[in-house]
Amino acid sequence: MNRKSFLVSILAAGCFVATSLLMPSTGNAQADPRVAKSMASLKAAAAKLGAGKLDGKEAVGGKDAPALYFGAAKINNNFDVVDAVSKEDGKGMTATFFVKSGDEYIRVSTSVPKPDGSGRAIGTVLAGPALESIKAGKAHYGEVPILGNPYMTGYEPMKDGSGAVIGIYYVGYKK
C-alpha cells in the first residue's frame, strides 16, 4: 500500500469513528430527518422552560406518577409543549414526555391518541425495544409499535441536573 492509499484509509476510518461517536445511539435504524428535527424542537422547548426535575406526585390517566417539572412548569397533564411540537411538524408527528417511576416509564404528557381515539394515551407505560435502549442509558431511533400501530420514532433519556435519568423525550409519527 502506498502512502497516499494509507492516508486515505486512515482518514476514512477517522471519519467513521467520529460519525459513530457523534450520532445518537440507535435501535435498528438511523434517525429519520423528521424525527430528528422534532426531537430537537421538543428538547429545546423543554429547556426553554428550565431544568427538568421530579417533585411530588400527580395522577395521570388514573395512574400515580412522579410530577415532572421543567423550571416552574408542571408537565403532568399539561399538553402545551407536546401539542406545539406536534403542530410544528404539521404531518402527524406525535410527542411525549415520559417520567421514570421505579422501573417503569409513564406517559405524563402526550399527543399520542388512545387506540380507540377517546383521548390521549397518558398513564400508559413504555414497553418494547426502546425501553431496553433507555435502560442502558442510550437513545433509540427506528420503527417501534406504539399501542398496536407502527411508528417511526426517537426516544432519548431525560436527565436531571445530577445526570440521573428521570424520564424520556419521545417523538414519532405513524407509518
List where the protein language model places each region.
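Short N-terminal helix-loop-first-beta-strand/juxtamembrane motif that initiates sensory/input modules
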Residues: 36-55, 83-105, 141-143
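N-terminal leader/targeting segments
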Residues: 27-33, 138
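Conserved beta-strands of PAS-like sensory domains
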Residues: 69-74, 150-175
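Extracytoplasmic/periplasmic sensor domains and loops in membrane signaling proteins
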Residues: 76-90, 108-148
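Extracellular/periplasmic ligand-binding regions of membrane signal-transduction receptors
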Residues: 31-75, 112-118
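C-terminal segment of classical bacterial N-terminal signal peptides
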Residues: 16-26
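Bacterial N-terminal signal peptides that target proteins for export
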Residues: 1-12
